[in-house]
Amino acid sequence: VAYVTVLIGLAGYGSHRLAIIFLYLKHARKKPVPLELFSELPLVTIQLPVFNEMHVVDRLLDSVSKIDYPIDKIQIQLLDDSTDGTVEICRDGIARLVAQGFDAEHIHRTERTGYKAGALENGTQFAKGEYLFILDADFVPNADVLQKTIHYFSDDKIGMIQTRWGHLNRTY
């Protein structure tokens, strides 16, 4: 009886794996495309939540400043809950972005209510954009990330987009 039960379980598991492989191969070549392109690009608020991440903040701000999107259609919020030297690095980085013409602000909270979710909620109260683009502190987005993704929102059925991401290295 135990042997038959295990055999049935393994057969079910194997069948499921084969079905997943089949579906992957069936749809692997299909690349999704937006239904239409926006005639005028919408305003996007880029939210960057950070907490004591002094080693990666400058890299993050530099990569965000290189995103290929009209500068007048971007609002950058650096949502900083840091308790170390990251606060000064954030302040200086935002000042550099403002000097480049970006609508950028450093929102520093001393009470971490809700942690990252709380920082995002707090920033959303001041967001001007029609869409939110959230990047973790260790992300380095490609310059074309908004151009490749924003047009999917022309479909009313799309409410969120998750893109593929990877890691640069193990330390920072």
Predicted regions and their residues:
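N-terminal membrane-anchoring/stem segments of glycan-assembly enzymes
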Residues: 1-40
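Internal catalytic domains of large membrane-associated glycosyltransferases
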Residues: 30-172
